[in-house]
Amino acid sequence: MTTQLDSLRNMTVVVADTGDIDAIKKYQPQDATTNPSLILSASALPQYAPLIDEAVAYAKAQSNDKAQQLIDAEDKLAVNIGLEILKIVPGRISTEVDARLSYNTQATVEKARKLIALYNAAGISNDRILIKIASTWQGIRAAEILEKEGINCNLTLLFSEAQARACAEAGVYLISPFVGRILDWYKANSDKKEYAPAEDPGVISVTKIYNYYKEYGYNTVVMGASFRNVGEITELAGCDRLTIAPALLKELQENSTALIRKLEYKGEVKAKPQPLTEAEFYWQHNSDAMAVEKLAEGIRKFAIDQEKLETMLSAKL
């Protein structure tokens, strides 16, 4: 029996959106993505206790300053979890930069270099790592610098066409346009509470971005993210990559209904437009209330979970 997950793998690279090693072993994705919230969840699992202890010991060996120890322990824990995941997935791990640096280009670049150095010291080459950065103007500029250094980036919390366009123009390796969080916003801010998959505003957004990239010949990978239901996933079959939480991977694995490719660009490739200026980026992005609110909210939520992680680690330092 061919499952929907098998069918999806034939047209899209399937990525696991989790830090849970057991789930990754079960569904055998090509890549895996983590974020501060997923690192926090994973840290509560008993099998991760040794990784936390090792990160704390590492931090204590680096510095006597408590504040610096906390930063070092956070970074090392994220990398330790990434290293465990890389033992299972054949492809890449996405590890996220502290969301509180989202509006600071230089600090983002420095944090990314540090994370890469930790991976490199553990014997992992750059081609197995993606550095996750929020798709702010400052984050996109940081990614532009990092890509030129051979550090590939995954630009996340992407909700607007302006963000997608700026990422492609900066030569970013991969973007993660969010689907479910866009749906959440429309449900909360309009009278319409139910959407068929094909009319789901998150699905429509990713479809537009995918077609725009193919139409203008951008090489940036489109990886749909943040799914609320299987319908959103099947409607985006054919997207370059999709990062999917274990519960939805399970549903896809248990369903054998035929899957039809929905995304495939067959038109001609056009000449690329002039890159957006900073002013144009802000005007276009800020014209979309959903994108403005969801980007800010996403950064706040990741920062809150980063602080919870710090509380847990500081008790051990």
From Swiss-Prot:
GO CC terms, sorted: cytosol
Superkingdom: Bacteria
Catalytic activity entry: D-sedoheptulose 7-phosphate + D-glyceraldehyde 3-phosphate = D-erythrose 4-phosphate + beta-D-fructose 6-phosphate
InterPro entries: Aldolase_TIM, TAL/FSA, Transaldolase_1, Transaldolase_AS
Pathway: Carbohydrate degradation; pentose phosphate pathway; D-glyceraldehyde 3-phosphate and beta-D-fructose 6-phosphate from D-ribose 5-phosphate and D-xylulose 5-phosphate (non-oxidative stage): step 2/3
EC number: 2.2.1.2
Subcellular locations according to the entry: Cytoplasm
This protein's UniProt keywords: Cytoplasm, Pentose shunt, Schiff base, Transferase
Entry-linked Pfam families: TAL_FSA
Any one GO molecular function term: transaldolase activity
Gene3D superfamilies named in the record: Aldolase class I
Active-site residues, record numbering mapped to chain: 132 (schiff-base intermediate with substrate)
PROSITE patterns in UniProt: TRANSALDOLASE_1 (PS01054), TRANSALDOLASE_2 (PS00958)
NCBIfam families: PRK12346.1 (NF009001), talAB (TIGR00874)
PANTHER family xref list: TRANSALDOLASE
Family named by the database record: Belongs to the transaldolase family. Type 1 subfamily.
Self-association and partners: Homodimer.
Role this protein plays: Transaldolase is important for the balance of metabolites in the pentose-phosphate pathway.
Protein name from the UniProt record: Transaldolase
Gene from which the chain derives: tal
